[in-house]
Amino acid sequence: MIELKNVNKYYGTHHVLKNINLSVKEGEKLVIIGPSGSGKSTTIRCMNGLEEVSSGEVVVNNLVLNHKNKIEICRKYCAMVFQHFNLYPHMTVLQNLTLAPMKLQKKSKKEAEETAFKYLKVVGLVDKANVYPATLSGGQQQRVAIARSLCTKKPYILFDEPTSALDPETIQEVLDVMKEISHQSNTTMVVVTHEMGFAKEVADRIIFMEDGAIVEENIPSEFFSNPKTERARLFLGKILKN
C-alpha cells in the first residue's frame, strides 16, 4: 500500500499540496484527474520520492519515506512512466529495458533479456528490440517506457500524464497498452491523466483534485454520472464536451 498522510508541499510561499490524505491499495487502479495546476503530478511525484513533502508522511509498504531511505525504497517498490519518455538515446530498446534489472537488481543478461522480450511482446514492439529510440514514434517510445517499467517487476507503477506529450493519433496505442496491463496484471497502477474514457474504463477509483486539494473521491460510475461537487460537475461538463 502507498499512503499519503496529511501531506503538504510548498514551493517557496506557494502552497502546492494541501493536507493530502490518500491510500492506494495493493492491486488497485487509481486515476487522478483535475485541471492543470491542481497538484496531480506533484502528488504522484511525492509518492515516488521525486518530490520531498514539506510536512506529513509518505508511506510505501509500511516504510515512511525520508531523505535518507527514499531512493532505496522507491527503487525497490515503485516504477514511473513520465510525460516524456526518458529513454537513453545511445542505447537500443533492448538495452534500455535490461539496464535497471542488470545494474540495480543484479539479474543476469539472459534473464533480463528474456523479461525484456516478454514485455516487448505485451506492448507490441518485439520487432524494435535492436533499434534506437530516435527511430521510433512518440507513441512507440512511450510503449517502450511502459515495457521498461514492467521489466523491473515492481509492485507499483505510477503514470504521470503518459499521453500528454504525444500526437493525437498515437495516444490510443499507448492507452490500449495501459488497458491491457490493467486487465491482465495485479500491478498497482496510479495514473494522472486527462483521458476520461480511459479513466472510466480502467479505474477502480477516481480522485479529483483542484487547487492542491482532493475535492472528490468516488468510483467511476458514480463520479462520471453523478459527481458530488459542483467543481467536479463543471470540470466534467467542459472536458467531456471537447
UniProtKB/Swiss-Prot annotation:
GO terms for molecular function: ABC-type amino acid transporter activity; ATP binding; ATP hydrolysis activity. CDD domains: ABC_HisP_GlnQ. Residues 2-236 form the ABC transporter domain. It is found in: Cell inner membrane. The keyword Cytoplasm does not apply. Disulfide bonds: none annotated. It is a peripheral membrane protein. ATP binds at residues 34-41. The keyword Metal-binding does not apply. PROSITE patterns: ABC_TRANSPORTER_1 (PS00211), ABC_TRANSPORTER_2 (PS50893). Pfam families: ABC_tran. One of its GO terms (cellular component) is plasma membrane. Keywords: ATP-binding, Cell inner membrane, Cell membrane, Membrane, Nucleotide-binding, Transport. Gene3D superfamilies: P-loop containing nucleotide triphosphate hydrolases. Belongs to the ABC transporter superfamily. Most probably involved, with PEB1, in a binding-protein-dependent transport system for an amino acid. Probably responsible for energy coupling to the transport system. This is Probable ABC transporter ATP-binding protein PEB1C. It comes from Campylobacter jejuni subsp. jejuni serotype O:23/36 (strain 81-176). The lineage of its organism: Bacteria, Pseudomonadati, Campylobacterota, Epsilonproteobacteria, Campylobacterales. The gene is peb1C.
